[in-house]
Amino acid sequence: MSEKTTCPACKAEHDPVALKANLMVCPGCGHHFRMEPNDRIDYLADTGSFAEFCKNMKSLNPIDMDGYEEKLSEAAKKTNMSEAVITGTCTIEKMPVVLALMSFSFMGGSMGSVVGEKISRAMLKGLEEKCPVIIYATSGGARMQEGIFSLMQMAKTASAAAELDRAGIPLFLVLCDPTTGGVTASFAMLGDITIAEPGALIGFAGPRVVEGTIKQSLPEGFQRAEFQQEKGFVDLICARKDQRALFVKLLKAHAGVGAQNGGAK
């Protein structure tokens, strides 16, 4: 008998198989558990349409950080992924799109040189193919084990997003729990439409760090998706079960955008 999964919000216990079938959302209270990239692909993409690229790109140890290779190996075994993001092309209701989906399970979704490169290449693939790009972001920020090389990815990904913007190619961001640090401070806030999953933690420094710095208590719900929408940082909050339908509407509304006049706005 499989071990039950406890919802951190309502404390209800769920069968893991049933929970996965419900898109990792608690049927009782609607709490959104963290979801792995391959499960998102199965839900979003037309059956059999996803074609991964940059699959075998793996991180090195550019600053010879002790234990980094071991952490990468452990993360790869745990997630069956080579890095913290999967990139590929697919169709959604027969409409072409480039997908990049991050995994918090792989070293906290931290952005090192490979993650930054893959996300940048995904955006440039959209530029090349003149089709929209959808990025699911979830990350603790820059990967400290790569030092300055990880911070360089902030500029790289932001530059790729700017290329899409200049060409008029739609970039849709979905901010998942949590999206923080250097990812928030770069490409995650540069989408044409910024979507968040319910209850997702979205910010730069986490609430505990902020409280410790300002020596004050923070308001309830600080940095959650609903708070960020109220403050204007998020355009809309979309439950997981409604995301495919939302993207069908968005892709239809933006059909042909960026393909006219050689991709120029």
Which sequence ranges carry the predicted segments?
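Glycine-rich anion/phosphate-binding loops
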Residues: 79-84, 109-124
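Charged, alpha-helix-enriched surfaces in structured cytosolic catalytic cores
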Residues: 21-24, 114, 182, 189
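A structural preference for short, pocket-lining loop segments at secondary-structure junctions
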Residues: 90-102, 118-142
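Short hinge/gating elements
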Residues: 8-11, 104-105, 140
